[in-house]
């Protein structure tokens, strides 16, 4: 998807973000390279805003492991090893991890989450679809699950927990505030 100057302007971006876009991409850019450039420049919130405006893609990325400060990917992601992200992991589609997931601040997905190990977000976890963690699910702040929640062992949520579908947990459940 080509993102032009006019296309971005129609979405009413912040002045600083639009100036950055014009300095770096005067002729426009493809969607994912623009998201990557924003993240590399430390403009993670701008990359998330852009994804809010333009939505997910059907792209699928497969990697052996993922270790980064922040990741914003518009498609779906398959990771064969561990995932370690210091701040934000934002995926437009689904995330499948054949190991554990650790995110420092926020984990947000536009579809389903499946992890063969622990899922740990020190901040919030927002998943529009189903969540499946074969081990523990540990969320430091708020959990929003739009679909079913299936966890092999324990669930621990620091504040509020909202689940849109059915819940199956193999161990204990601890929620710091309301469970909806």
Which ranges hold each PLM region?
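Short, glycine-biased loop/turn motifs at secondary-structure junctions and
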Residues: 1-180
